[in-house]
């Protein structure tokens, strides 16, 4: 990517972009693969235990998404300061995101520890006593891990902002290996069940968090956070971070709530549809790995370009990286459509009815993803890197409630649609988002935003 002529020196070489992207792809592949293995190990505990863990993980996912969004705000601000050659301000932004994340995660953890029973009752209503018992146990230990998750996410985002994605990849590897090893020992060795699974997650997150914090304090780190003294609140920097982080957090939070609404609708379609939907969700996650990795990379690349005042380079790299995301989507989805979908289904013990539904949904996913997934999910990160987070939030929330939720309920409850109707509502959501984001990108409105 160095062949294009700019008026100034290109900020990124092809080798630098490759070095940024490949670890991110490996990190995502690792996370998805080991996450599946983790789910299978926990499922050996029993149906009530799995139900309890599943309920809590719904809330955990919401919290992780919000913390990831806050970390994104810090990464965008730090990236732009790096591009502007203001390393002192970049380090100050790094310290502020650590302050924001630690404060938020400790507050949420305290609320959950004290009120976990009321929270579970309030969200999920009346559930069986044995499921509630397992859920409360898992919720307690999950809450204790929130500060570790938050600080790990912030630290990993800061390393990516520097263009160093190897650190987050290796930290993720360590975290997942410790988690799987802990599950094996505590669940199968000591027969600790849900408590063992929760302890393994807590320890793995603590280890990864400590590793990232240690590396952030090394003298050679550009975004070095020297200690608590550096984390003194700075209102100006906090506002800049939250200007990106809050809209992204609201967007992610609403997205999870929308998914819950659709999940409850899926449950009305019967056991076969529930099983088919679960399998389709699991397998489709693998197909998004390259585009997700590109979406993480553009925060660094576009952020640094705009921080340096190089709008021309920001647009050029954004287009090339979006093309890379599309190439990844085409390779993964065409391979799945012609070869892998049926093979993947053979890994699951599904009834013929559920297998047929899952295959239909998966093949439609392959087709629609070719055109809409990268522009619906990778492209908005380009806009966020410029500070255009309020626009992406507005579009995403409107699209989700109108298409992903509204159309799904209309088609299923009023028109008698099945599982494919629910997924078609999701595809309409993608199409609408893609059109809005592409128009915003082409018109250049996103380049008018100011972060620093």
Regions found by a protein language model. Name each.
Residues 1-24, 78-145, 189-246, 302-368, ...:
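Short alpha-helical transmembrane segments in multi-pass integral membrane proteins
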Residues 19-35, 141, 175, 204-208, ...:
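Transmembrane helical elements of multi-pass membrane transporters/channels
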Residues 47-58, 135, 139, 198, ...:
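Small-residue hotspots at the loop-to-helix junctions and early N-terminal turns
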Residues 50-110, 149-168, 274-340, 373-395:
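Small-residue-rich hydrophobic transmembrane alpha-helices
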Residues 62-65, 179-183, 209-213, 286-289, ...:
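Hydrophobic transmembrane alpha-helices of multi-pass small-molecule transporters
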Residues 71, 141-160, 168-176, 197-212, ...:
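Short runs within selected transmembrane alpha-helices of multi-pass transporters and secretion channels
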